[in-house]
Amino acid sequence: MMSRQAFLCSLGSLYLSLLFVFLLMDVYARPANNSALKEKPADSRDENEILPPDHLNGVKMEMDGHLNKEFHQEVFLGKEMEEFEEDSEPRKNRKKLMVIFSKVDIDNDKKISAKEMQRWIMEKTDEHFQEAVEENKMHFRAVDPDGDGHVSWDEYKIKFLASKGLNEKEIAEKIKNNEELKIDEETQEVLDNLKDRWYQADNPPPDMLLNEEEFLSFLHPEHSRGMLKFMVKEIIRDLDQDGDKKLTLSEFISLPVGTVENQQAQDIDDDWVKDRRKEFEDVIDANHDGIVTMEELEEYMDPMNEYNALNEAKQMIAVADENQNHHLELEEILKYSEYFTGSKLMDYARNVHEEF
């Protein structure tokens, strides 16, 4: 019969063997860790931090030539625009709107004049400008890793391509050694356009280095007269069909690329044409000769143009001026709240006197 000592030794050996088998199975069951090959570098940036935005707050037209559908709300609400969300409580939004009304009505006569609205529009536009300046500081730090206060085109190019998913160290090495970069045609086209824009933002004498102020102009052309001209040229280039560097009404209202497949799409296209026709004829074409020049479009696009702000103020008042006294009263602005804030306030008339 096996001795007690021999039995215990045998049991211990069996336990160690089973433990070894389980550990081996666990190792092979785990997925291979390839994250080092596929994972982006920790300092790679999101594409939205790298690319100039298509939408510019407080500017009437998008970078791609589309009308800014939120322009009225942006120049009326400024930084408070985010607070007026459609799903927020109507009573709270009504109170916020009443507070805004009292701020615009600086002479406290219970109505808003065109001059008062003009002053308010300029103030809210400046808020958007200051917001862009603060955001630019963060974006500039993202592309200025050595913190020397300047960003070269190559530094920006590396960050941009890294944001597209390419390995940042490999890109940097290839650019340093003047090696060919294998990127797709679409990315190359974007890169070429960005380089043109970079050159325009580079104040004389050009050195392809942007400081923080120049980088602000690169991202936000509305902050620089020179870059605003460049933006206008880009928009006209995209819309101008006969190459005369001017826009006719038919060129301006041309439908986006695509076919109309159903009634809903047709309605969208009808709205596109109607809105752009009105904007062209009533606002952009200043001398009403049926042609929009670069100079006219530049004046239209300039968010700090006081004459434009006054015209905008008059238009905003006209939308809600039901008693035709050329002023806005509280009841009117509450009734047309969706136009001014993007939020519809229900039962505005019933509550206006009890809350104000």
Curated annotation (Swiss-Prot):
Gene3D superfamilies: EF-hand (1.10.238.10)
EF-hand domain ranges (all copies): 92-127, 131-166, 227-262, 272-307, 308-343
Pfam families documented for this protein: EF-hand_5, EF-hand_7
Residues involved in Ca(2+) 5 binding: D321, N323, N325, H327, E332
Binding site for Ca(2+) 1: D105, D107, D109, K111, E116
Record has Repeat as a keyword: yes
Entry coiled-coil feature ranges: none
PROSITE patterns: EF_HAND_1, EF_HAND_2
Chain residues that bind Ca(2+) 3: D240, D242, D244, K246, E251
GO cellular component: endoplasmic reticulum; Golgi lumen
GO function terms (MF aspect): calcium ion binding
PANTHER family, A to Z: 45 KDA CALCIUM-BINDING PROTEIN (PTHR10827:SF98), RETICULOCALBIN (PTHR10827)
Job of this protein: May regulate calcium-dependent activities in the endoplasmic reticulum lumen or post-ER compartment.
The family this protein is said to belong to: Belongs to the CREC family.
Name this protein carries in UniProt: 45 kDa calcium-binding protein
UniProt source species: Gallus gallus (Chicken)
